[in-house]
Amino acid sequence: MNSNAVESAIKQGENLANKINLAKTTTQLDILYKEVENYTNFINNEFGIIDDFSEKNEKYCELSFYAYMAVNEKSDNLEYYIVHPEEMASGVEDFLDYLKSMKWLA
């Protein structure tokens, strides 16, 4: 396994989580959604496995699910997080927890 790719995935993931957490508008989150897409493409290519049950022969890494969940949960509850800026979006917390767990390297 490429340790540089792992370090990059962690650093990019933490940076992305911070950006999602700081986003205050749907426009910002829409822009971040594209960043999430680019990040998950990298994660899937570097660390993904081919799903035997998928019709497509593509690699998939479970960390991708958590990245999309982070931006979607923040978007779905944006009004709440604007009123409560001291709280980290729960989807972002879950993404960071899974990122730090390293379970996605299996």
Can you describe what each PLM-predicted range is?
Residues M1-E7, S101-A106:
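Short intrinsically disordered terminal tails
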Residues N2-E37:
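Short terminal alpha-helical segments
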Residues A9, G13, A17, T40, ...:
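Small side chains
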Residues K19-L32, F47-S54, S75-V83:
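Charged, low-complexity interaction regions
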Residues K34, Y39-D51, Y60:
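Amphipathic, interaction-prone secondary-structure segments
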Residues E62-A106:
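Amphipathic alpha-helical binding modules
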